[in-house]
Amino acid sequence: MTLQVDCERLAAAHLIVRRQLLAERSAPSHWSGELSSSPLSTATAISALVLAEQGGTSSGLPVYTPGEEPSHAHEIYRGDLSELILQSVRWLAEQQNEDGGWGDTDRSVSNIATTMLVQAAFHLTGVPAKYGNLLQRSQEYVDSQGGVTGLKRRYEGDKTFAVPILTNCALADMVPWRKVPALPFELASLPQRWYHLLNLPVVSYAIPALVAVGQAKFHHAPPRNPLVRWLRASARKRTLGVLTDMQPASGGFLEATPLTSFVVMSLASIGLDEHPVVRRGIEFLLMSVRPDGSWPIDSNLATWNTSQALTALNWNLSDQLPAATTKPTDDVESALDWLLNCQHTQRHPFTGAAAGGWAWTDLSGGVPDADDTSAALCALSAWQRRWPQQRGTDVKRAARAGIHWLLGIQNSDGGWPTFCRGWGKLQFDRSSCDITAHALRGIYSWRGLLQIESVNTTFIKKIEEATRRGLQFISQNQQPDGSWMPLWFGNQWNAQEANPVYGTAKVLTMCHELGIPRSEMAQRGLLWLVNAQHAAGGWGVVGPVTKNPADQACSVEETALATESMLQFSPHHPLAEEAAQQGVSWLIEAIESGRHLEPAAIGFYFSKLWYYERLYPQIFATSVLARANRACHAVSQAAGVM
């Protein structure tokens, strides 16, 4: 392609963002990143700590045997817990939006779920009088959104988040218990392998909420039916055992503040404040609070960040471009060891996932999933292509296990879900186009590298059949306008909170890497993405718009992903070449002005819970500008030869 941009400015921008990304390493081996502080997480943590403090012990604090207590948590417990809670309440007060509500981040519009949870936290702390005007304004916002009815409407029948939110509100005496739907927690006592057959009202990764929140509802508002009442009473002890077995060493379910908080507050409210699950959950909350009194939605996305960063950098952790060494340096070897050690080698107790997958984090609360496993496979294949003679046995062994893991969770519809095969009732358990595209990329990235083509034809046939079915799923789920919708990413300025730019860019990248850029679905997707480009050259919100401040119209993340797919397709379509040039120019200007340090809240964590990750714009921009830089140099060299 002919990339008509200033190659010197491009190289300088690439160097800026690349060095910034390298400087963000938590250690020589990996990137922990930093998730946005979350009013929703902070509110649920406050509620959990307050309800635990009001529990059955004289001090309201968990009792640890000598030598068992964690030092940091113990120090906070021995001090004044109320000081932490008041600091967190002050932080929440500072985050209120002009319309009276709260959003999921400091860059998010208000939503009814977060606002109701913040209200509950204020009520439970016993300090609403000090914030009377604040609470009055928030109630006006909640009323304008439809109250409890509006909350249920937001989650469209998915009880995973709606019921825990209503439970939190009921514990704060904001909502009567009769408005909190009951959850059949007794079903958790059945064998885990049956869960996907039970038509549960929550997603596969929310069993802890099913148990704890379900028990809270049962305790505070038992069912009238004596048979149901007896059945659930008899299942309490067994399901608490399930909860105990699922809790990771860190105490944080999924390393997630909201999920852990819902479990802690629910059990504490029924007199189980000294239960080991509650004690470990409180320890997790106290260990994960930030200096300003806020909590993120999760501890970190270290594995996800690291896999993508290593791929974007092509395993070159040196300031020099290209790297001066012909073999991996010590820090590169360390990064490989770290990523290999993140692979789960045993069946996971939380979802029953088989060995072989990767989670989003290296911490104990992580659970293997398709997106992170695919990212790790892409990173490892980049290593194998760069250094085929180095650590080949270890890398190939991990890759084979990862591919087998992905093949094992492919759904019957041909698509890939996030965590578990066969859970198709609720949106966040269904197959999705972005995850399916990533799984296909992860598997296909190892073509020709495993050296098994001639000795394991059965494995190859499985891969070919899985690929065929995956492509069929993606084709069948293409939108009429040519775009694809992702599952775990959105755009808050879109009226449906959808992000077809992210989804379409991910699918187009897959089409390029699988060698099908000229397929009908790829060409339709390409035309849609070209037409979605803003006049300024970037990508961002498309379709019906709710609010659209000028500075939020385009993001570095969306522009980088879309531009990379345009660069990949530029040899096949002149419109892609023109769009790529405009996208690269937009990114150069964005990096020169420092916008790559301003992440956008495009991530979903659970259903409709927004977040941003500080490293996303840096990782995505590093990847696309590396590709653009190579294209620019190729053009310059060709011109020099002529």
Task: Map each language-model feature to its residues.
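Surface-exposed extracellular loop regions of Gram-negative outer-membrane beta-barrel proteins
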Residues: 279-289
